[in-house]
Structures are given as structure tokens and as C-alpha cells.
């Protein structure tokens, strides 16, 4: 499973890429691999105010449907409609296929997430 350095990871297998006071959120390689071929993605509304643990969206595959949770508080600034039009993009490039861009409300929440090294250890225990 690919794990990218410089990102933050949740125990629910979401990744967070921070750029200034904004963060891109998507699902990890482990998550997309576990789901199998993704056939449908539901994203949040732009402008939605989300708290850590809220449902960010839904990913459905031929095997299962899974909620995706936001690991941080934030306001949705943008969503990636390309993955709605072609959900297989997430299977092919999970770290390039972000779901939402949010304005971070509290950067200290990042301390609750895992580094790439910590996430690799977490996966080894799964």
C-alpha cells in the first residue's frame, strides 16, 4: 500500500494535505484497495460547515458503500467534481483524487492525526 510522506492520516483511512490554512481531504490507497472498484461518489455541498468526525461524503464500490469522515473542522471551499464524473480516478490515483478542499478552523486538530510513518505502523496492525 502506498503511503505518501508529508500528509496527515486518520484511523478511518482519510488523508489530509495542508496548504496554508486550507486542507485537501481524500481517501488513502488502503481505503480504495479495500473497497475495490469505486462506482459512485457523493461529495458535500460547497459552503458546508463540518466538524471533525462528520460525514464528508460517500464512496460506493462493487463490494460496499462507505462513509468518508472529515478528520478536521472546516468549511468546504471546493469539491472535486472530476471524481464524481469518473469515480475510478480514486482507484487509479487516491492521493491525487481529493474529495474536498476545506478551510481549516483549528490547525491543532492535525496533532490528532498520524504522520506517514505512524500510519504505516497502524496499517501493519490492521
UniProtKB/Swiss-Prot annotation:
InterPro entries: 2-oxoA_DH_lipoyl-BS, Biotin_lipoyl, GCV_H, GCV_H/Fam206, GCV_H_sub, Single_hybrid_motif. Keywords: Lipoyl. Residues 22-103 form the Lipoyl-binding domain. One of its GO terms (biological process) is glycine decarboxylation via glycine cleavage system. Binds 1 lipoyl cofactor covalently. One of its GO terms (cellular component) is cytosol. The keyword Ribosomal protein does not apply. The modification N6-lipoyllysine is found at residue 63. Its cofactor is (R)-lipoate. The glycine cleavage system is composed of four proteins: P, T, L and H. Belongs to the GcvH family. The glycine cleavage system catalyzes the degradation of glycine. The H protein shuttles the methylamine group of glycine from the P protein to the T protein. NCBIfam families: gcvH, PRK01202.1. PANTHER family: GLYCINE CLEAVAGE SYSTEM H PROTEIN, GLYCINE CLEAVAGE SYSTEM H PROTEIN-RELATED. This is Glycine cleavage system H protein. The gene is gcvH.
Amino acid at each position: 500500500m502506498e503511503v505518501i510522506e508529508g500528509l496527515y492520516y486518520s484511523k478511518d483511512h482519510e488523508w489530509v494535505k495542508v496548504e496554508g490554512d486550507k486542507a485537501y481531504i481524500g481517501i488513502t490507497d488502503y481505503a480504495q484497495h479495500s473497497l475495490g472498484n469505486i462506482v459512485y461518489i457523493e461529495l458535500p455541498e460547497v459552503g458546508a460547515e463540518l466538524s471533525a468526525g462528520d460525514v464528508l461524503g460517500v464512496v460506493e464500490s462493487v463490494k460496499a458503500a462507505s462513509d468518508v469522515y472529515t478528520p478536521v473542522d472546516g468549511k468546504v471551499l471546493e469539491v472535486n467534481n472530476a471524481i464524481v464524473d469518473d469515480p475510478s480516478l480514486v482507484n487509479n490515483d487516491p492521493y491525487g483524487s481529493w474529495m474536498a478542499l476545506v478551510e481549516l478552523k483549528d490547525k491543532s486538530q492535525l496533532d490528532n492525526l498520524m504522520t506517514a510513518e505512524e500510519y504505516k505502523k497502524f496499517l501493519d496492525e490492521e
